[in-house]
Amino acid sequence: MSQSSASSIFTVSRLNQTVRELLEREMGQIWLTAEISNFSQPASGHWYFTLKDDRAQVRCAMFRNSNRRTTFRPQNGQQVLVRASITLYEPRGDYQLIAESMQPAGDGLLQQQFEQLKQQLAAEGLFDQSHKQPLPSPAKQVGVITSASGAALHDVLHVLQRRDPSLPVIIYPTSVQGVDAPLQIVRAIQLANLRAECDVLIVGRGGGSLEDLWSFNDERVARAIFNSHIPIVSAVGHETDVTIADFVADLRAPTPSAAAELVSRNQIELVRQIQGQQQRMEMAMDYYLAQRNQQFTRLEHRLQQQHPHLRLARQQTLLLKLQRRLEESAQTQIRLLSKRTERLQQRLQQVQPQGQIHRYNQRVQQQEYRLRQAVERQLNGYRQRFGIACSQLEAVSPLATLARGYSVTQTPAGALLKTTKQVQAGDKLTTRLQDGWVESEITQVTVAKKSRQKKVVTQ
């Protein structure tokens, strides 16, 4: 035996090891559809079974950490779709499969196609949030792409009629199930974009099995939704149903009824919001008017406090006080002089100086006359000054000016209107007259050429 022949001699264990490594390296993971037989589950929790078809069979194991993710209990005779790795059990030289996942064969194959298309479109960026279009708020016209005889259309129309009866709806009838359904859905989306009648589209159907909903997992439908210039809301099946169309659409609704609610306004809630806004506006207006009334009351009180009549009344009161004090002072002087005169008379009576008495009487009469003259002159002076002060106050009184036919006009800011530069057309003015106020609005502002001033025209 040559040396090269000796080096190629295998032991059984080496052979089994080499075959195992070759199988695992070359085959890797595969998808296999087959029928289950000889299913068993020992206390360890692992599953052991045989996968077979009508001409061959292979042993398979599914360990506990993998089979706990399976959503069903396998049964003998059941067709399944298995994702598994090929290996060799070295002690006996038996090759077998180690299953990683398992699904019922019918839905499982479709689910595999679903996952493959989902990964492909995601890699192309069709699911990216940056491509999502915002829904119009509010929508002016809604398009519905679904079966004309299906329950989904009835649900959508019922919700739209209840929430927003005035919202126009255009129906693009199409098949939603069967071989021709994907192409019809694509054409309906393209037609809606071509006619550009709607600003949002609802694409969907009612619930069903995975096969029933498969039209919305079609790649052509997904690309038509992605290329639509009109925002699309997907509404396929029930809340638990997920399709490729849901990932591509601008917004996914769990049901057709929910899609109708998303694209419509709730008129009852809208009326409630308007009523709330109206109530807040009325409260704000009441508060504004109350503040204005308080401001007018304060201004009226200040104006009354500065009224010339009040100032004249205060001056008159002061003058009366001075007059009383002067009279009291004069009477006090007279009483003192009278007492002094009486004392002098008593002294004169004792000495009977008739000549002196006569002279003193004359002097007393003269002093009394002078005193009365002085008091009268002083009173006349006070009266004259009081009259002059009253005339001066009347001359500068705003009310006296108003009584002569003039008026005082205030700008919206409350300042006195002196020049046309303070106002413009559309402003509202408040004018004070002799007997009240006038509210007016400026319709035109004209500048006088001679005096280079503006003429204010009010209505």
UniProtKB/Swiss-Prot annotation:
Subunit structure: Heterooligomer composed of large and small subunits.
Family of the protein in this entry: Belongs to the XseA family.
Sorted UniProt keywords: Cytoplasm, Exonuclease, Hydrolase, Nuclease
InterPro entries, per the entry: Exonuc_VII_L (IPR003753), Exonuc_VII_lsu_C (IPR020579), OB-fold_nuc-bd_dom (IPR025824)
Name of this chain's protein: Exodeoxyribonuclease 7 large subunit
Catalyzed reaction equations: Exonucleolytic cleavage in either 5'- to 3'- or 3'- to 5'-direction to yield nucleoside 5'-phosphates
Molecular function in Gene Ontology: exodeoxyribonuclease VII activity; nucleic acid binding
Any Gene Ontology CC annotation: cytoplasm
Functional description taken from the UniProt entry: Bidirectionally degrades single-stranded DNA into large acid-insoluble oligonucleotides, which are then degraded further into small acid-soluble oligonucleotides.
Any GO BP: DNA catabolic process
Keyword match Hydrolase: yes
Residue runs in coiled coils: none
Enzyme class, broadest EC rank: hydrolase
Subcellular location, record wording: Cytoplasm
E.C. numbers: 3.1.11.6
Pfam families assigned to the protein according to its UniProt record, in alphabetical order: Exonuc_VII_L, tRNA_anti_2
Main localization (coarse): cytoplasm
